[in-house]
């Protein structure tokens, strides 16, 4: 099967319906009441996906057209787990954002309806978009899926935090994060290693697409380039024993 290409029928950026509350998710429910979720970072790993969604079904590789994968999201979980390096700004997680000319290889799986509220809470700072993934053969899926896309700090503060500085502090401020979506930070080292290993475990074209179609905040430097320059050595670093299962690919 040939690898997918990003040159055919690109999606229009910003044309993806936004899901703002649990009720909106009903519009993308598959027959049987399950919801399809797109994995683009740690959820490329089936082990990670099952640790988050123990009863998931149908874990598979897919392609998502019209999106770019970028390290531009300050993630508090890395501070909680002691793996953020604040001095070098290495505490970025992944997000995706609409980009007409791009295509990324992802995973898709189904979760139960009752898992949706917890999913929304866990991905509190993201914009939930309804998308149509496709197989690696280019055939669109029958059902839409939900992807966690880049939000904006202002929208997040006014919407999800209801304009409350206390809510923001509990989620971000206590980690000295005053801006979530930023382009001047670098990948959390253990998280990046985990994502690369997870993509590699999926085989081709997932591995090559992750290296060549995942970018730093400058939207120019690919992860393949980063790992051979500034990020050299990341793939040789082992997580601490307590996190080996969580960040083992």
Language-model segments: residues:
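A glycine-rich, hydrophobic/aromatic-adjacent loop/helix-cap motif
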Residues: 2-249
């Amino acid at each position: 099967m040939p690898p997918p290409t990003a040159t055919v029928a690109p999606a229009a950026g910003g044309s993806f319906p936004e899901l703002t509350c649990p009720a909106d998710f009903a519009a993308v429910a598959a027959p049987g009441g399950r919801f399809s979720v797109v994995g683009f970072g740690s959820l490329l790993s089936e082990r990670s996906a099952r640790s988050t969604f123990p009863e998931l079904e149908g874990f598979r590789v897919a392609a998502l057209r019209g999106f770019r994968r970028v390290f531009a999201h300050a993630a508090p979980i890395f501070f909680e787990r002691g793996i953020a390096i604040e001095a070098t700004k290495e505490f970025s997680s992944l997000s995706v954002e609409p980009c007409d000319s791009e295509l990324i290889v992802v995973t898709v799986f189904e979760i139960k309806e009752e898992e949706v509220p917890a999913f929304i809470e866990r991905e509190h700072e993201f914009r939930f978009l309804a998308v149509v993934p496709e197989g690696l053969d280019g055939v669109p899926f029958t059902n839409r899926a939900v992807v966690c896309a880049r939000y904006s700090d202002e929208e997040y503060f006014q919407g999800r935090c209801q304009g409350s500085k206390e809510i923001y502090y509990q989620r971000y401020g206590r980690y000295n994060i005053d801006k979530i979506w930023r382009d001047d930070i670098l990948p959390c080292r253990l998280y990046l290693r985990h994502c690369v290993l997870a993509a590699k475990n999926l085989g081709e074209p997932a591995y090559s697409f992750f290296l060549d179609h995942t970018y730093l905040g400058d939207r120019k430097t690919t992860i393949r380039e980063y790992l051979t320059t500034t990020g050299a050595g990341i793939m040789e670093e082992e997580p601490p024993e307590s996190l080996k299962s969580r960040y083992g690919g």
